[in-house]
């Protein structure tokens, strides 16, 4: 149930965000997964949510299986090419701040 709520929240946020960008270039989205995209759990649901944005015209790309301790360089790399970057684990907080 928590996974479904998280997925709905991500999709709802982007739906609301897309309304304000009518006629404008859609933001590109980057994401970092803590596990593999087909793990049957959190990472898979996050991946499915992010990939669903592509059918609405968003440019989406991400990196999977990123260790939390080594995430800062991945976030910097994604931030250079995307307008918004999502961390899918609380453990990524320090890496995002750097």
Describe the residue ranges of each PLM region:
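Extracytoplasmic "Venus flytrap"
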Residues: 30-53, 61-74, 78, 89-92
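Residues at structural and domain junctions
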Residues: 9, 35-36, 82
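Short, low-complexity disordered leader/linker segments with a strong preference
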Residues: 1-27
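Extracytoplasmic ligand/sensor domains, especially the bilobed periplasmic-binding protein
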Residues: 93-98
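A sequence-composition feature that detects small, non-aromatic residues
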Residues: 6-16, 69-71, 79, 87
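Loop/turn elements at helix/coil->beta-strand transitions in domains of secreted/extracellular proteins
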Residues: 26-28, 56-59, 81-85
């Amino acid at each position: 149930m928590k996974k479904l709520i998280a997925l709905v929240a991500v999709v709802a946020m982007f739906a609301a965000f897309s309304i304000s960008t009518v006629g404008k270039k859609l933001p590109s989205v980057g994401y970092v997964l803590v596990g593999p995209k087909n793990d049957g759990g959190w990472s898979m649901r996050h991946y499915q949510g992010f990939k669903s944005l592509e059918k609405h015209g968003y440019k989406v790309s991400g990196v999977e299986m990123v260790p939390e301790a080594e995430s800062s360089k991945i976030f910097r790399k994604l931030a250079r090419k995307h307008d918004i970057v999502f961390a899918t684990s609380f453990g990524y907080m320090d890496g995002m701040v750097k």
